[in-house]
Regions:
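Positively charged, low-complexity terminal tracts
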Residues: 1-68
Length: 68
């Protein structure tokens, strides 16, 4: 069974994104769930990959800002 350490939800247009930092016997991970009109899709990022995930996301945001 997963233990939720922290959970945050954001709404963007007609979608909700749920960010759950979880832990189970295999380790800690981030689950990002997209809820769009009742349909849910999720990705899971193991804790060791969170810094790299953030680095790439920061680069994407910077490119978006530069593109205007």
């Amino acid at each position: 069974m997963d233990t939720i350490i922290k959970s945050e939800t954001i709404g963007v247009e007609r979608k909700s994104f749920i960010f759950d930092l979880r832990e189970n016997p295999r380790g800690r991970f981030l689950r990002i769930t997209e809820d769009a009109n009742g349909r849910r899709d999720a990705i899971v990022i193991p804790a060791p990959g969170l810094e790299e995930f953030r680095r790439v996301l920061d680069e994407i945001i910077a490119a978006h800002d530069q593109a205007g």
